[in-house]
Amino acid sequence: MSDRQQVTNARGERIAIVAGLRTPFAKQATAFHGISALDMGKMVVNELLVRSELDPKLIEQLVYGQVVQMPAAPNIAREIVLGTGMDVSTDAYSVTRACATSFQSAVNVAESIMTGNIEIGIAGGADSSSVLPIGVSKKLAHALVDLNKARTFGQKLQIFRRLGIKDLLPVPPAVAEYSTGLSMGQTAEQMAKTYNISRADQDALAHRSHTLANETWASGHLRDEVMVAHVPPYKQFIERDNNIRENSDLASYAKLRPAFDKKHGSVTAANSTPLTDGASAIILMSEGRAKALGYQPIGYIKSYAFTAIDVWQDMLMGPSYATPLALKRAGMELEDLTLIEMHEAFAAQTLANMQMFASKKFAEEKLGRNRAIGDIDMSKFNVLGGSLAYGHPFAATGTRLITQVCRELKRRGGGTGLATACAAGGLGAAMIVEVE
């Protein structure tokens, strides 16, 4: 049996990435304060359709993701369909795979095209860290259910008497991994210690990311893939990511204190991604349908892979597991790639993965390979900056990476690119695209 992955439909046509778009990414409680993930999702999908001059009625499926779920609209995908002029019969469902969510939505649409069930679909994701599902304590939740069944005033009074003042306080969304109790920042700190990653190296990577992202915005390269967002009350607009340090100074990074291990730590707010609001989406078609409609795709999906590892130790190593599998399925080696886009959740996590890419020992012991994945050529790596600068709305990052690497390859005359990410739960994702 061949290890090669055939990302084609029954007619042998490739899966085309026709277009991609995102909102600007904004730090928590800034430009998108009060704007829900659903509203951002509708905003970007509608603008993507307008820019692409694609009739919404032609969309056969929309798969969309959200990590921080809102009880009021649990199926964000269906609400986007109903809010953007698509046919009411358009298939729509929501997915979640932590920080790899829109990798999953993209693959789901691609596989629907591969099986011949559809010809055109939209994938993406959105998250808001500013509009959050604030919960209640377990005791209050229990009491509220009992109140629905209580018939007399006396019964209701007895229920209220079970509650203390603390039970009435709101409960913010959990930031820790359910299985381990560790936050992502604590996991990054764990990885920094495991792989002996210095504070200086983490700060240097963050500085590089901000510097390159600022240069990219100044060059105008992102204007066609980042929309101008107008938000209520429509007196202001946002047209650029607001986390990027325009005058990044490496020396200033050293001034920040560790955020997760106050005494011995090295992970700080400056070398981590901030809580971020934003949305992104891509249009996928069969190669034949794209050609028939007159589109010139920005890229094609060559291979993809998802992996999972143990959550107790260094669980943000997803790229080191998913990338070699995607490369194998594409019949490629790391050195064959033109560009590499790796999600920078934390500088420590990114550097740990880069280190393991180059490790023969890791390849032998963890991957069952007789050679390392390969040394990363920094002239190919996150050449426009990464998540440390742009920010990280959890469900939106995957399709941001896919669009960005495709468009940059297009500017360079084509080639192949890797987009890869770690994710909570020990998950990993990787996709290889080819651009003509």
UniProtKB/Swiss-Prot annotation:
It catalyses: an acyl-CoA + acetyl-CoA = a 3-oxoacyl-CoA + CoA. It is an enzyme of class 2 (transferase). The active site is at 99 (acyl-thioester intermediate), 392 (proton acceptor), 422 (proton acceptor). Keywords: Acyltransferase, Cytoplasm, Fatty acid metabolism, Lipid degradation, Lipid metabolism, Transferase. GO terms for biological process: fatty acid beta-oxidation. One of its GO terms (cellular component) is cytosol. GO terms for molecular function: acetyl-CoA C-acetyltransferase activity. Its EC number is 2.3.1.16. The keyword Plastid does not apply. Heterotetramer of two alpha chains (FadJ) and two beta chains (FadI). Catalyzes the final step of fatty acid oxidation in which acetyl-CoA is released and the CoA ester of a fatty acid two carbons shorter is formed. This is 3-ketoacyl-CoA thiolase.
